[in-house]
Amino acid sequence: MGDLLVFVLSGLVSGALYALLATGLVLSYSASGLFNFAHGATAYLCALTFYELHSGLGWPAVPAALLVVFVLAPALGWGLDRLMFRRLARVGETAQIVATIGLLVALPAAGLWVVELLEDAGAPVKPAENQFGLPGVGPSPAKSWQLADGVGIDSDQLITWVVTAVVAVALWVLLRHTRLGLQLRAAVDNRSLTELRGISADRLSSVAWMIASGLAGLAGVLATPLLGLSAHDFTLFLFVSATAAVIGRFASVPLAFAGGLGLGVLQNLVAGYASFAESITGFRTAVPFLILFGGLLVLTRRARTAGVAAVDAPPVDHLAGASWGRRWGVWAVGAGLLCVAFYTVTTPFWSGLLAQGLAIALVFMSFTVVTGLGAMVSLAQGTFVTGAALVAGLLMSRGWPFVAALAVGTCVAALLGALVALPALRLGGRTLALATLALAFLADQVLFQLRWLRNGDSGWSIPRPVFGPVDLSDDRALGVALVILVALVAAGLSALRDSPSGRAMLAVRSAPAAAVASGVSVLRTKLLLFTLSAGLAGFGGVMYASYNTRITATDFTAMTGLVWLAVVVAAGVRRPQYAVVAGLVFALAPRVLADYVTESAHLPVILFGLAGLALANDPDGYCAAVPVRLAKRRAALVPAGPSPTPPLPETGLRPDPSGAPDPDPPPATAGGTPSASNAGGAEFALRANQPRQADDTGQDPAPPAFEEWGSPHDGVLGEGLGRSPRSPAGGAPPALELRGVTAGYDGGLVLHGVDLVVRAGEILAVLGPNGAGKSTACRVAAGLLPVENGTVHVQGRDATRDGAVLRSRAGVVLAPEGRGIFPSLTIEENLALYLKEADARAAVYDRFPRLGERRGVPAGALSGGEQQMLALAPLLQLPPRVLIADEPSLGLAPRIVDGVYALLTELRDAGTALLLVEEKAAEILGIADTVAYLSQGRVSWCGPRAEVEEDRLTEAYLGMGT
């Protein structure tokens, strides 16, 4: 019983640290969608700072800890968010993973380099070595208390428990009982919808990163007595705590916190009671990684992939279709010059460095296969390199020839890659990266500790081969041989990419569901990618070990593989020739820096790590960015011709019989007067065919308001709902106006010179088929999508440069396609985001009793009609100046649609300008004042509702016009 209590208590200490780190991971991921692999490095940097302030400069422990946790760590999080994380949130997941891994590499090295510089300058700092038994926040030495026979705790453990409990309560209060916490949880659900509600997602991101970094700093300070100043141990702590973040689904702080505590206890219990594994060398130290890998497999849900394309689609190949000389000429000339240089220009020293770079380039090209072709991030490449080299060394010690040992080592690495891939392939993205890293650590701790394989600390000798008269012990001969090998491998990978198998790999990368529909086996393709990549890494590993003439089990650890990944992806991972550049840079840069900048070993590591920062701007790497920039420069020199005008669709508008063009056609507007087509320039004479029937008062009838949606006049309504400014005062500017707007995505234009006007108290219905650009127009009007050309005006003010937050604060509200609600928030919390006052929310419940009865229910549990009711209800209480509704009837029953339209007409009568996008033209025409038809990104026509011919409009939708 005493042993059990000891295991539990000590496990709660490490569990508390796991909980703090996991909570920070969840907060930062929730705010930005970014998993921060450098979270443990932040903790280490804070621990190092605390140690130097306390032990070096002599500061008292508590003030030093407070400065680190509440000032320096949040400042670091804020700075990284502004410089890096915000931009990374908009790139593909591969670039996100690699960039944060680069930061993981760079931050500890940066801290150690600063300590070196301060020490050289004479500052009273202490060497930052892997010291243990360092003082913490409490008394030094730590005080101890005996709770029972053989069971004790010390002051450092007690402080860790108390502080962790206080942090848990503080986080619960922040997230559940403050408006900031509500906004943070809303950003977790839907970042863009948060901005559409006037809440700055960037500000929330900064706050979340500051809190997350503060928690990492707190974990670092508390862990100093336990872990010392070992960057490696802090990194391992981070990766184990990721299991707790998985328990919380990267969304729930309480679950992640509890998971961290339980993880620490479980780790100790397994290590303490797994007597069956006592004979396995390294098992106890490998327990955290077993738990991490098992947790990832069990807890990670398989994401739905149907209909989803990869977000990191390959860049445009500007040399597609070019001749061989244009595509490969520069690289072939470079290879030839390098071969000549080995025997004419370079010294033996530089010949050796170049040969080393070419050898490591073979390893780097394995990333081209698994990440460049497969979009999978493997962090186990160092394991494949070590495994192949150890096997080759073992065989050569038994008298095997080099070529045979190389072949067997390559096959062993390929087999090891297949074994790693089989359990991990059900994962993807960050979870696959974490799973492969866990297996890499397991190999380091268990597999490569086998005595017969590692041959002690000295390892195995791998002499360079001799092929007839060619002795590769000469660095020059080895360099030329490696140039030939690298060229052959690069040519083979390029041929693979262009082969049917390569196209299948690219299909699986871009759209797995579509690949399956085409008869491609996703599992078999991914397994092939992993196996081929591991085999290539093993082949390169044996050649690299041959260059060094020896291999040990610690030459290429899992952490080494992280540095490799950062270097090769920063250069460009999609093409094998970019991996060659990365290999040469990796070999030559440290020597160049040592000769011309500094001899510190930390600076090259910093630069290699910070190379990942460039991925925020060039996610495909700096080598891949060169042809893109050259192509843009060439395109800028070519004058652009006039863009072709698509033919106008058949509509309910009849062209002027004279056919005479208007010499100065006015823009197509939504102001109620006939306008010319801004696509063709021909003036249309709008003629009535089926006008709406007016009632005795001359007003257009609205659809019936159903009882469950509330009466338009019962309850307490928002200010101004009695107004009916259907005819605004002369000279009043439009509520919303788009003038000549051109916009699109990733350089592809969707809207071409769109002009739309909507006035207060008016409904503009925008119609058009799928792909016409209706939703894009909504995003532009709401500020979610910037314009390429043209302007957007709100109440007569130029708001073109305003984002969604400023547009929302100016009174422009977008109800996006689907449901504009936050699914995991309750009805009360959804309303509170828009209506701060309790009286306003009470008025909504009076108006919509069904919402009041279920105010504590998560919005995601409501029916489609109830969700749309929830989205519109606060707008009735506090009417916006402009409401943009994208497909408000989508997925709703006809009876519910009538209720939605009744609420929309009520908003119109309250003075709100409405821009409604619908595909169901028949329904929307019943409430519209003005109609615009969008086709191929252009406003084909626009005019009053009474002048729309519904039969011809139907023909236009169905493509039946003559």
Residue ranges of model-derived segments:
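Conserved ABC transporter NBD signature motif
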Residues: G790-A799, A810, A838-D846, W941-G943
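ABC ATPase NBD coupling module
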Residues: D798-R819, R855-G856, V948-T954
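Helix-to-loop junction immediately C-terminal to a conserved catalytic motif
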Residues: A782
